[in-house]
Amino acid sequence: MKTQVAIIGAGPSGLLLGQLLHKAGIDNVILERQTPDYVLGRIRAGVLEQGMVDLLREAGVDRRMARDGLVHEGVEIAFAGQRRRIDLKRLSGGKTVTVYGQTEVTRDLMEAREACGATTVYQAAEVRLHDLQGERPYVTFERDGERLRLDCDYIAGCDGFHGISRQSIPAERLKVFERVYPFGWLGLLADTPPVSHELIYANHPRGFALCSQRSATRSRYYVQVPLSEKVEDWSDERFWTELKARLPSEVAEKLVTGPSLEKSIAPLRSFVVEPMQHGRLFLAGDAAHIVPPTGAKGLNLAASDVSTLYRLLLKAYREGRGELLERYSAICLRRIWKAERFSWWMTSVLHRFPDTDAFSQRIQQTELEYYLGSEAGLATIAENYVGLPYEEIE
């Protein structure tokens, strides 16, 4: 097999890169370890920045998103008996976010790829990357017991935190930055109307809570829990009771409860690896960085990586400026670290940490009061929440 760009991973970042390249006439093949149903079964993020919405539109996969996505012009933070709304649209110069689940984004991209006939190999086992620093890298993998080889010009590693792509870079070439948080999020998905038309983030003495949504009829709620907690110890009734206890009373009274479609506990981590490239291998998305979900940045950072890599590949193929690809990591990391900072900050001011003393607790409350009581503070939150601009590539 032969292609121009080999893409490892058929999650949203790999599929989005593949679709953009296909529309630009650049041949690509995607290799995915799992089945399509497994990929679609992942319950993930649902808040899309303006930049990602624009990128999906550019890729020609925005029809269902335009119809079913919920445009949010604001977000609310509740703390210390107060509720403060942040007017995202006014404070960011007209930008908004769109609530549209990652599962739906993935489905749209899968259908678009199938319709255009581009190659995706699912259940590709024993994937290995070779000659990454040479002129002609290649990928080997197994499919139905047969060992196959895929020759290419470049490899995009879009296979997530546990994927083979980052593992294919010599450890001594990488610098890892990481913070693991001492709690997780217990999330519940239910076919109940959302308690609010905008997201509500709550800082409460019992711990953080988030009221989110996937559609006008499907809600997603989260509560902060210790890492020692097990999902099976949380009945639906226990979850709803705990959620209500952490929300402002007027919100809790309106909460519509119902049977859970899914419950899971996600640990929280900040993680960045530098550099994000090695020879002709380029890491994108969770393969290179993880953010705690508090800032809704994970999927959106993957999209900005994809945008950067796509535009650099266009320069390489259309203008013969392959040397620009050497700037990929530096361009991406400038935006990534700003999103890491915002996600860390949101996590720090909204959660209860097990070692927090009275002084730290008062500082946390004052931090929220300052940012939410100041036009400059509100604007800072808003511009980060809707997404910082993508860097132009000359």
Swiss-Prot record:
Tell me which residues bind FAD: S13, E32, R42, I43, R44, A45, G46, V47, Q102, D286, L299, N300
Spell out the residues of the site Important for catalytic activity: Y201, Y385
Q: Which reaction does it catalyse?
A: 4-hydroxybenzoate + NADPH + O2 + H(+) = 3,4-dihydroxybenzoate + NADP(+) + H2O
Q: Which keywords accompany this UniProt record?
A: Aromatic hydrocarbons catabolism, FAD, Flavoprotein, Monooxygenase, NADP, Oxidoreductase
Q: Record's Pfam families?
A: FAD_binding_3
Q: Which residues bind substrate?
A: Y201, S212, Q213, R214, Y222, P293
Spell out the SUPFAM superfamilies in the cross-references.
FAD-linked reductases, C-terminal domain, FAD/NAD(P)-binding domain
Query: Which superkingdom, per the lineage?
Result: Bacteria
* Gene Ontology annotations of biological process type: benzoate catabolic process via hydroxylation
Task: Specify the enzyme's EC class, one word.
Answer: oxidoreductase
Q: How is the cofactor bound?
A: Binds 1 FAD per subunit.
- Pathway membership: Aromatic compound metabolism; benzoate degradation via hydroxylation; 3,4-dihydroxybenzoate from benzoate: step 2/2
Query: Its Enzyme Commission number?
Result: 1.14.13.2
State the needed cofactors, names only: FAD
InterPro entries xref list: FAD-bd (IPR002938), FAD/NAD-bd_sf (IPR036188), HB_mOase (IPR012733), RIFMO-like (IPR050641)
The UniProt function text for this chain reads: Catalyzes the incorporation of an atom of dioxygen into p-hydroxybenzoate (p-OHB) to form 3,4-dihydroxybenzoate (3,4DOHB). The reaction occurs in two parts: reduction of the flavin adenine dinucleotide (FAD) in the enzyme by reduced nicotinamide adenine dinucleotide phosphate (NADPH) in response to binding p-hydroxybenzoate to the enzyme and oxidation of reduced FAD with oxygen to form a hydroperoxide, which then oxygenates p-hydroxybenzoate.
Quaternary structure, from the entry? Homodimer.
Give the family per the record. Belongs to the aromatic-ring hydroxylase family.
Name of the molecule in the record: p-hydroxybenzoate hydroxylase
Query: Per the UniProt entry, what species is this protein from, by scientific name?
Result: Pseudomonas aeruginosa (strain ATCC 15692 / DSM 22644 / CIP 104116 / JCM 14847 / LMG 12228 / 1C / PRS 101 / PAO1)
